[in-house]
Amino acid sequence: MPTAIKKTFAYGAHTVTLETGEIARQAGGAVIVNMDDTIVLATVVAAKEAKAGQDFFPLTVDYVEKFYAAGRIPGGFFKREGRPTEKETLTSRLIDRPIRPLFPEGFYNEVQVIITVLSLNPEVDPDIPAMIGASAALAISGVPFDGPIGACRVGYSGGQYLLNPTVEQLKASELNLVVAGTEAAVLMVESEARELSEEVMLGAVVFGHQQMQVAIRAINELVEVAGKPEWDWQPPAKNEPLIARIKELAGAHLEEAFRITSKQARTQRINEIRKQTFGVVADGVEVPPTGNELKDIFHDLEAGVVRSRILAGEPRIDGRDTRTVRPIDIRVGVLPRTHGSALFTRGETQALVIATLGTGRDEQIIDAIAGEYRESFLLHYNFPPFSTGETGRMGVTKRREVGHGRLAKRALIAALPADEDFSYTVRVVSEITESNGSSSMASVCGASLAMMDAGVPMKAHVAGIAMGLIKEGNRFAVLTDILGDEDHLGDMDFKVAGTENGITALQMDIKIQGITKEIMQVALAQAGEGRIHILALMKQALASHRGEVSEFAPRMLTMKINPEKIRDVIGKGGAVIRGLQEETGTVIELQDDGSVTISSVSAEGAQLAKEKIEAITAEVEVGKVYNGTVVRLLDFGAIVNIMPGRDGLLHVSQIANERVNNVADYVKEGQAVRVKVLETDERGKIRLSMKALLDQPAE
């Protein structure tokens, strides 16, 4: 029997166990992580050789949730897990981002990391165990990897940081931050906050990095007893003569090219320089250098040109200094028949953002392994190939689009109105029509404007900005509002979104080690300046939300009824509610607590439906006079309808002062009559009288 090797450590209020050696033994590395009964299996398999002609690092990370982990059977016809959910896609990205920069430069062997959720404690999100498991599996596999990493979640409540709060604790927390890093440095941050200060956010990152050291130590201890031999892999030796030759041929030309401020013109010129340089280098050589070798050297030369100029204090690629935001142009209400729209342009990045209002029936129903839930705020980010002047496939939503949409959504949640104040379902779509860096933050700005334009009573405008970093030794420069090239050639991508009052979302991806607390402090402060500048421009374009929703949006009315009256509104087989909806042209939604939502394109129709529901659910009052209709004659009286769904008995003795021998001599079916309520009993039966009225008017 195989023997499992285990390492256990306390992690906040949780106990975490790392285990290897019993399951998935044919994988390059396999670790089971148990965090208070949330259990994941993380496996790593790597190809021993890179494919011929491979010119990038083919790392794949797949996080997979199994319904059996929560004791559930999947819905749908096939009753099995299907394509990745949004949660699976986002968690896969969360794992990928901190481990990718730790593989050595020039390592092009295919690596696949698969994390499978085997058991779920509803109070423990599997994402942190999954990140720890992926790190541990890589560490014991022997694959070239400069880890391990640790990861943890940080909450903030009552002025105190919480380590790995439960799902229930997070509901009351002002912060939901995931941080990952090595023993020496933070590599990745993903967070959502309720307008917190830069100091609190930075403190959370530092707190998380300190606390994750226990996980890193446990992984290192596991490697000592269960680690496989490290691969005998060496990076390709640098061809110094070739590097010098390419620099001689292309260096001066690249210096000039990176002074071209237009992205398309600059890209075209760089491509020309690359083509000319490679042609000259390969000409007349017996063994020409490989494409990978040439590409890597040219990339390093590009990076050197851009980075050295910025660190020397020279203007950036587009002529700006390090703190200036690109020119911004804002238009709202650009699409006449949509509920709300905005066109947000920042330099060569542009987002056309549309807000649509719907009813409760438009909420997204999500069948997660922990149980079904509904989302009333949706944000979708689309990045078509034409936005960068390229061709490409359409149709399938890419992981990057899911991730950018989620970041923008998290940035806006803190500013949304409460459900009881605004019961609409809101869907925002960001169409990126031009891109040269920071399109996700343009989506945040555009979404805030579009929702305000749609009449959504946002608490405040939300703006986002992307920061970059260039660092060489002890010299560094933080860049405000980075371009695509600065993101590609820099050391950090640092996105911050928030209101005037504080930060609502922070995302950080760091490609190098050695980013200190002081550098992050400078970056956050500089991002705050940029955010306030953008917010001022947004307020100039649209200071507050529209006074009312678009004429094309559904009108919503909400009311509360006695839950015991719900069946009266629905009627037998749904007949009453169907009739109401057809008569008034509305959609009526009932909740178990008696909440009623009425939606209609017509405000008059919604009001009419509300009045009719009030009539149906009104309580019959003893002593009150009603105008009723005779619905049926009996030998001993008549049945009279006095309110929608409420009938009473008009006894023969209560029809007239004299003796009534034949009811039909006094009332007919369909006849309008005035009656007084004499009595109602505990079973809801109603006794009526015509005789008691005499000449009393109907109330």
UniProtKB/Swiss-Prot annotation:
Q: Does the keyword Metal-binding apply?
A: yes
In this chain the KH domain maps to 554-613
* Principal subcellular localisation of the protein: cytoplasm
Q: Does the keyword Transferase apply?
A: yes
- PROSITE patterns this protein is in? KH_TYPE_1 (PS50084), S1 (PS50126)
Q: Which residues form a coiled coil?
A: none
Q: List the catalytic activities from the record.
A: RNA(n+1) + phosphate = RNA(n) + a ribonucleoside 5'-diphosphate
Q: Classify the source by domain of life.
A: Bacteria
Question: Where is Mg(2+) annotated to bind?
Answer: 487, 493
InterPro entries, per this entry? ExoRNase_PH_dom1, ExoRNase_PH_dom2, ExoRNase_PH_dom2_sf, KH_dom, KH_dom_type_1, KH_dom_type_1_sf, NA-bd_OB-fold, PNPase
Q: Which major enzyme category is it?
A: transferase
Which cofactors does this protein require?
Mg(2+)
* Database matches in CDD domains: KH-I_PNPase (cd02393), RNase_PH_PNPase_1 (cd11363), RNase_PH_PNPase_2 (cd11364), S1_PNPase (cd04472)
**The protein's Enzyme Commission number:** 2.7.7.8
Supply one GO CC term from the record: cytosol
Q: What does this protein do?
A: Involved in mRNA degradation. Catalyzes the phosphorolysis of single-stranded polyribonucleotides processively in the 3'- to 5'-direction.
HAMAP family hit by this protein: PNPase (MF_01595)
- Can you tell me which family this protein belongs to? Belongs to the polyribonucleotide nucleotidyltransferase family.
**What's the name of the protein?**
Polyribonucleotide nucleotidyltransferase
Which organism encodes this protein?
Aromatoleum aromaticum (strain DSM 19018 / LMG 30748 / EbN1) (Azoarcus sp. (strain EbN1))
Report which gene this protein is encoded by.
pnp
